[in-house]
């Protein structure tokens, strides 16, 4: 298996990264945002929200609340409230109606307001920023598809586009499809077919996120932290773990899908990928399936995506706990 990620490491695991996060918070989105906020070598340029785990109203409110609790002076921009061509599909069976079921420690009424300009804000910020930008998406790809369709030149200043989604095998919302891709398959297909992203596009699929499991030992380590936000992390991950056990029967830990996407952006050497051709099925039986040419058998279709398949799990959690220590200084 070829590691195609180290070439983006720029010589140091602590090289500064400029990132924009497009998200649909969501329990694991909250942890992903926390990781980015606590990493000393990361500048969050902006946060945009999209339909997904719940409605846009709640994903936006949740993002605002997290940024406030983390003392982050980062603007939140509301994006697409529905898919490009279909009715919305929400993950309320996992995240509850408000996206953060069972969580009581986030502000009910965030002080800042979001602006309804996600696509334009992404374009102007990324295009005008004096350094290359890493774009990370942890929800359905509706905002990203609209960005690429409306402002195709934006890819000139995108160093990497990393999205959590897809699978080379089974799904988690249907037998065939992973939720983020299923929630807007047309958007995902448009993104994957964007030629100007070839070489920059990274998919973080279920294959690898189901290897990075947050278990009782990690939760116990989080309990030992004295800062207030650690209590929020413990609460939300405990609820998330219980839900996964009830819905999927997974008892040895909960996959932190979206955290993996942010961690790939910030610590590239922890991950191993394979370049392959990937597209999205729009057929009714396999709707939302990411069709992956793992063994390069379809020679007429050149590789367009770096698909992340392996992680250094022990080093991941060691890094994660070390970064969360910085919560005391936010």
From Swiss-Prot:
UniProt keyword list: Glycosidase, Hydrolase
Record-level Gene Ontology MF annotations: nicotinamide riboside hydrolase activity; nicotinic acid riboside hydrolase activity; purine nucleosidase activity; uridine nucleosidase activity
PROSITE patterns in the cross-refs: IUNH
Lipid metabolism in keyword set: no
Active site residues per record: 257
Superkingdom of the organism of origin: Eukaryota
One GO cellular component, as annotated: nucleus
Protein family according to the UniProt entry: Belongs to the IUNH family.
Alphabetical list of InterPro entries matching this protein: I/U_nuclsd_hydro_CS, Inosine/uridine_hydrolase_dom, IUNH, Ribo_hydro-like
UniProt keyword annotation of Hydrolase present: yes
Name of the molecule in the record: Uncharacterized protein C17G8.02
A Gene Ontology BP annotation from the UniProt entry: purine nucleoside catabolic process
Pfam family membership, one: IU_nuc_hydro
């Amino acid at each position: 298996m070829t590691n195609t990620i180290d070439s983006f490491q720029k010589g140091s695991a602590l090289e500064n990264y400029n990132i924009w996060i497009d998200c649909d918070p969501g329990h694991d989105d909250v942890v992903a945002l926390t990781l980015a906020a606590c990493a000393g070598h990361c500048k969050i340029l902006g946060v945009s929200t999209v339909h997904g785990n719940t409605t846009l109203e709640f994903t936006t409110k949740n993002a605002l609340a997290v940024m406030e609790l983390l003392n982050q002076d980062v603007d939140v921009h509301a994006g697409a409230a529905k898919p490009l061509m279909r009715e919305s599909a929400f993950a309320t069976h996992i995240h509850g109606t408000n996206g953060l079921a069972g969580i009581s420690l986030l502000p009910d009424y965030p002080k800042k307001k979001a602006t309804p300009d996600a696509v334009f804000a992404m374009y102007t910020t990324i295009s005008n920023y004096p350094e290359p930008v890493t774009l990370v998406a942890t929800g359905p790809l509706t905002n990203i598809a609209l960005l690429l369709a409306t402002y195709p030149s934006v890819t000139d200043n995108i160093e990497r586009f990393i999205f959590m989604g897809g699978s080379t095998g089974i799904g988690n919302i249907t037998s065939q499809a992973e939720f983020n891709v299923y929630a807007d398959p047309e958007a995902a297909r448009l993104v994957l077919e964007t030629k100007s992203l070839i070489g920059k596009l990274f998919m973080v699929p279920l294959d690898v996120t189901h290897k990075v499991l947050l278990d009782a030992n990690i939760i116990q380590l989080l309990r030992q932290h004295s800062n207030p936000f650690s209590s929020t992390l413990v609460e939300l991950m405990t609820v998330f773990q219980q839900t996964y056990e009830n819905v999927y029967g997974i008892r040895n830990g909960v996959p932190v899908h979206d955290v993996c996407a942010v961690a790939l952006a910030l610590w590239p050497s922890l991950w191993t990928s394979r370049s392959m051709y990937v597209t999205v099925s729009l057929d009714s039986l396999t709707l939302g399936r990411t069709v992956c040419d793992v063994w390069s058998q379809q020679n007429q279709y050149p590789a367009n995506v770096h698909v992340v398949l392996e992680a250094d799990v022990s080093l991941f959690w060691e890094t994660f706990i070390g970064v969360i220590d910085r919560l005391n200084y936010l």
